[in-house]
Amino acid sequence: MFHQRAAALEYAESNNTRFLTELKEFLTIPSISTDPDHVEDMVKAADWVANQFNNLGLDKVEVFPTEGHPVVYGELSSETQGAPTVLVYGHYDVQPAEPLELWTTDAFKPVQRGDNLYARGASDMKGQVIATIKALEAVLKSGDLPINIKFLIEGEEEIGSPNLGEFISKHLDMLSCDFALNPDTGMIAPDLPTITYALRGLAYFEIRIDGPAHDLHSGIYGGVVHNPAQALCELI
């Protein structure tokens, strides 16, 4: 396993220029999920990811339509009996580039300055999507795949993933795994890989509090009849 790891790292290093070129190509797609004018770009980005999976020779690759933007799925099975399964989550949508005046270059024309690459989505999270895909490529080129791997790459993370819950509910068997990996986090330092193991999600609630049907005199009823505003403050 150690030799395979070393070989994979060597492969990644020798193919770094190509990997970077492909990332730049991905970054030129303005896959802005909040903007209806970019619906075609969302489909283009989803197909681009699916094409990456196909080029790797994954066992199954599919672009699933949703009520919003597509979900891209891919999986590759290990030949090792009883191998664990990891599900890698990612998203191909990005935030709008506005305010444009804060950019020194076009947000969708990647520019490299030293070791840094500047473009919308470079770090959130097209860079991580490509890094994960290319890491798998490096492993496959250097030996056998030790685990089963699945990818779920959505296009609505930047708008709260409104259709992801339903998609997951409908495909529980397909998405079954031993653990999940979300590379959409930060690092302590550029040269120190970091795993975030407690990441909060989103939860939406609507609270309704019913009170008196008409105004009550605060001097007479204050403190006796619970004020809905006070009850809400206590709940929050």
List PLM regions with ranges.
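Acidic/His- and Gly-rich active-site-bordering loop/insert found
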Residues: 2-120, 139-145
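Flexible loop/turn segments at secondary-structure boundaries
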Residues: 35, 70, 95-96, 158-161, ...
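Broad gene-expression machinery/nucleic-acid interaction feature
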Residues: 71, 148, 202-204
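Fold-independent oxyanion-binding glycine-rich loops
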Residues: 90-92, 114, 155-156, 183-185, ...
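Short, conserved micro-motifs enriched in small and acidic residues
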Residues: 115-130, 158, 222, 226-230
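Acidic/histidine-rich catalytic neighborhood of metal-dependent amide-processing enzymes
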Residues: 123-198
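Midchain, well-structured core segments that form catalytic/ion-binding scaffolds
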Residues: 165, 172-236
